[in-house]
Every structure is written in structure tokens, then in C-alpha cells.
Amino acid sequence: MAEGFCKNFYSNKLDHLEVQIAKKTKILRVLEQKRAELNRRVRFLREEISIVQEPSSNVGVVVEKMGKMQVLVKTNPDGKYLVKVEPGVNYDELKAGVRVALRSDSYDVHRILPTKVDPLVSLMMVEKVPDSTYQMIGGLDEQIKEIREVIELPIKHPELFENLGIAQPKGVLLYGPPGTGKTLLARAVAHHTQCKFIRVSGSELVQKYIGEGSRLVRELFIMAREHAPSIIFMDEIDSIGSTRGDSNKGSDSEVQRTMLELLNQLDGFESHNNIKVIMATNRIDILDPALLRTGRIDRKIEFPPPNESARLEILKIHSRKMNLTKGIDLETIASKMVGCSGAEVKAVCTEAGMYALRERRVHVTQEDFEMAVHKVLKKTGDLNSDLRKLLK
């Protein structure tokens, strides 16, 4: 009996010790994880300390290559220095305007720095090229021809201008009433040229603080040079390019500074850099003459309201994928839309489809188009007539 009691006692004791061992093992694993985390933090802090203890570098901008692994750099506020380039730096990448790091003691170039660009400017670049094509634009054959000569031809075939001995055009201005296809044509140009497309609205360049708008314009053209060939599309240019007056308001003077920086950039960059500028506005009458002069804007393309044949072509384009009943007379519909813009013609097709959906039909009838014309003209007729009178 005593033997059985001792056996049970030690058996329970062993079970208790095994439970304690399992708990201690679990605690040990947690402590090992904490130790590993602390060791990682110690290594990170040691690396930071070593980085902080390293000698600092000065930032400079390359002005010109001088040969034999030497470049002329500009530093603020010291001035310009002729410095050596360390063997680890790619000498071919050192071009004018590139930011470099200089040793604090010897001023040798030891690293190439990335270009400093404002995040707001980086967001202006359209990564995905628009899928608009010239076939999706109706009634603008002459405008398409003119903009292709100024923008697309110099980018795709610059040798033609070199053989003729003429300078490439720098920019083009698209002007006309709202809804006549200015932005749509700019998207189509970006699609067919297959180059970087940078879109910016003029109101985005109007900033609160002095000098911010000018800085955005400078960095916008810097980014365009880095990603050349590129197209800068500036919509609503009248917000910063209006005629200068004698106003002493701070807001007006800041807008004028932004426009002066834009004029400087248009004069500064070379035409063979594959940077083209497209500007669009509804109010060409208020633009400053300095912005419109030849050499900055080489061609001005007018976008008038479409005539009857152009409206018919636009109707055919936007109704191409619609499920239409037989016998629809698009010519009659186009003749009823006198003075309408291309955007209003597209709105008629959309409204006609909405009338068909309202009656649970899968096809669009002639009556749907007629009701859509009546609705669109009733909704926008008075407003657009006032705008056209203003633009005359």
C-alpha cells in the first residue's frame, strides 16, 4: 500500500513539473523574441549613429562639364566651383541642372541626387495615356490637321524640320466656346504621340503664398524636360494669363508673377527638347498680348460651334454603339440643334438613351431623340446664348 502511495505521489509530482516546464518554455520563447527585437533595435540605432557621425555633404547643381572628370557646380550661397568627380560616379549622367552631393572637406562629387520636384507637380502627370483617338472626334477635321502639324509632326519626325531649316513650333492655343472639343482633341494628341502627358489647370497654379505659383511652373517644366518627349496641357489658361493691369492687390500681383514665370519658361526651353505646350481657354479676348505673341504660342486654333454637317458627324459617332431602331433620321435631329456645341450633341444621345431606359426598352426611337433635343435645348439654350454673345 505504501508503495502504491509513493508511486502516485511521484507521478503527480512529475506531471506538475512537466506543466511547470511547459510554462517556463513558453515564457522563454517570449523572452527570446523580445531579445531578438531588442537586438534589432540596437543594430538599427548603431547604424543611425554611424550615419549621423559621418561627415555631411553639400548640395550643388551641375552647370557645365569641364572634361577630365571635372565639372562646374553651383552652390548656394557660396557661388560656383570647379570640382572633381569621384570614380564611383557615372560621369555621363552629369548633365546641366543635375543635383549632386559634394564632400564637405574636398567638395568632390560623390553622389548624384534625385531631382527635387513638388508632389503636387508629380500628380499632374497622367500615367495612363488617354484612349481618345481622332476617329472619336467629329466636325474638327481642320483643327485636327493644324494641331497635328504643330504637335505630333515635330515629335515623330523632327528630321523634317531640320532638313527644311526651320524651327519647331513650341506651343498652340485652343480657344472657343465651352464644349467644342478642345480638351478632347488634346487627349487624342496625347494618345497618338505616345509621349508623357502632363495636364494642369490654370487655377492650380494660383497659390496663396508669394512665389509658390512661380515655383510650381518652374518644377512643371523641369519634370517635362526629364520625361521628354512630353506634352504640357494647360487648361483654363485665362485664370493666370489675363491682361496685366495697374491693380495693387496682392492676389493680382501674385497671379502676374506666375504668368511672368510662365513667359520666362516658354522663352527658355529649346524647341528641339521635345516639349510641347497646349493651352486652352474660353476667353481669348482677356489674355495678355505677351502670352499670345509668336515664338511663345506659334499657332492659335479656333473651335467654333459645329455646323449642321459637323453635328451630324458627332451624332453618328456617339450613336455608333447605341441600339437604334430602323428609320431614325439623324439629319433631321442635327438640323434642329442650331447653335449647339459638341458636348450638347453628345448630351442628346445620352438623354435619348435615358428616355428608352425609362420605358424599359432596349432600343432608342426617333421620338426619344426628339424629346432629348427639346430637353437639352431647353436646359442649356439661354446660358449658352449668353456665353456666345460674350465670346463674339
Swiss-Prot record:
CDD domains: RecA-like_PAN_like (cd19502)
Superkingdom as given in the UniProt entry: Eukaryota
Record flagged with keyword Nucleotide-binding: yes
GO terms for cellular component: cytoplasm; nucleus; proteasome regulatory particle, base subcomplex
An example molecular function term from Gene Ontology annotations: ATP hydrolysis activity
Matches recorded under Gene3D superfamilies: 1.10.8.60, Nucleic acid-binding proteins, P-loop containing nucleotide triphosphate hydrolases
Cross-referenced InterPro entries: 26S_Proteasome_ATPase, AAA+_ATPase, AAA_lid_3, ATPase_AAA_core, ATPase_AAA_CS, NA-bd_OB-fold, P-loop_NTPase, Prot_ATP_ID_OB_2nd
Keyword terms, alphabetized: ATP-binding, Cytoplasm, Nucleotide-binding, Nucleus, Proteasome
PROSITE patterns in the record: AAA
Residue sites binding ATP per the record: 176-183
Signal sequence interval, chain numbering: none
Subcellular location: Cytoplasm; Nucleus
Keyword Metal-binding attached: no
Pfam family, any one: AAA
Chief localization: cytoplasm
Job description of the protein: Acts as a regulatory subunit of the 26S proteasome which degrades poly-ubiquitinated proteins in the cytoplasm and in the nucleus. It is essential for the regulated turnover of proteins and for the removal of misfolded proteins. The proteasome is a multicatalytic proteinase complex that is characterized by its ability to cleave peptides with Arg, Phe, Tyr, Leu, and Glu adjacent to the leaving group at neutral or slightly basic pH.
Assembly information from the UniProt record: The 26S proteasome consists of a 20S proteasome core and two 19S regulatory subunits. The 20S proteasome core is composed of 28 subunits that are arranged in four stacked rings, resulting in a barrel-shaped structure. The two end rings are each formed by seven alpha subunits, and the two central rings are each formed by seven beta subunits. The catalytic chamber with the active sites is on the inside of the barrel.
Family under the similarity heading: Belongs to the AAA ATPase family.
Protein name from the UniProt record: 26S proteasome regulatory subunit 8 homolog
Annotated source species: Encephalitozoon cuniculi (strain GB-M1)
UniProt gene name: RPT6
